[in-house]
């Protein structure tokens, strides 16, 4: 399971002209689900995403996680993160989970974030989405479990 996380000052996702999720300061999480992923990996990745210390403390040091910084999370499904790009000029998506399995694990990941009392907004799984963000820093990390 893969999360591309970006520290943002604001982010939103729109589907068919409707804003489905919007946050101020926090994390934009682009989530990719691979074939061998399961709930245990989703739990571990959620723990890492919410615990990752990439927000500045009073001394300007990256020492706070999103909850400590008072931020929110916007989770957007992105199957392209599971692409195999090592060969050729066209990505292969053979490493990605089936749509049904990926949606179940995406929903599970979102629910785990919410269970941590995290303000968690979302896109719409498998929809054609427009994502807007202001990357703060820029600060972007690839987390994989």
From Swiss-Prot:
Q: What class of enzyme is it?
A: hydrolase
Q: Name one GO biological process term.
A: response to heat
Question: Do you know which InterPro entries this protein is assigned to?
Answer: Daa-tRNA_deacyls_DTD, DTD-like_sf
* Positions occupied by motif Gly-cisPro motif, important for rejection of L-amino acids: 137-138
Tell me the impact of changing residue 129 to K: Alters stereospecificity, confers binding of L-amino acids while slightly decreasing binding of D-amino acids
| Transmembrane domains' residue ranges | none
**A Pfam family annotated for this UniProt entry:** Tyr_Deacylase
Keywords in alphabetical order, please: Cytoplasm, Hydrolase, RNA-binding, tRNA-binding
Question: In terms of domain of life, where is this protein from?
Answer: Bacteria
The compartments listed are: Cytoplasm
Q: Its catalytic activity?
A: glycyl-tRNA(Ala) + H2O = tRNA(Ala) + glycine + H(+); a D-aminoacyl-tRNA + H2O = a tRNA + a D-alpha-amino acid + H(+); D-tyrosyl-tRNA(Tyr) + H2O = D-tyrosine + tRNA(Tyr)
* Assigned EC number: 3.1.1.96
Note what the entry says on domains: A Gly-cisPro motif from one monomer fits into the active site of the other monomer to allow specific chiral rejection of L-amino acids.
Purpose: An aminoacyl-tRNA editing enzyme that deacylates mischarged D-aminoacyl-tRNAs, has no observable editing activity on tRNAs charged with cognate L-amino acid. Edits mischarged glycyl-tRNA(Ala) more efficiently than AlaRS. Acts via tRNA-based rather than protein-based catalysis. Rejects correctly charged L-amino acid-tRNAs from its binding site rather than specifically recognizing incorrectly charged D-amino acid-tRNAs.
The family this protein is said to belong to: Belongs to the DTD family.
* This protein's name: D-aminoacyl-tRNA deacylase
- Species: Escherichia coli (strain K12)
């Amino acid at each position: 399971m893969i999360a591309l996380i970006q520290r943002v000052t604001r982010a939103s996702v729109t589907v068919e002209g409707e804003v489905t999720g919007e946050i101020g300061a926090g994390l934009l999480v682009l989530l990719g689900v691979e074939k061998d992923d399961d709930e245990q990996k989703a739990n571990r990745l959620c723990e890492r995403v919410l615990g990752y210390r990439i927000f500045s403390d009073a001394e300007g040091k990256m020492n706070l996680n999103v909850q400590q910084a008072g931020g929110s999370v916007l989770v957007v499904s992105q199957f392209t993160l599971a692409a195999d790009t090592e060969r050729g000029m066209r990505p292969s998506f053979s490493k990605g989970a089936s749509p049904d399995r990926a949606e179940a694990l995406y929903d599970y990941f979102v629910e785990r974030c919410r269970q941590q009392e995290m303000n968690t907004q979302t896109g719409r799984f498998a929809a054609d989405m427009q994502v807007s963000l202001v990357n703060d820093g820029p600060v972007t990390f690839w987390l994989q479990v």
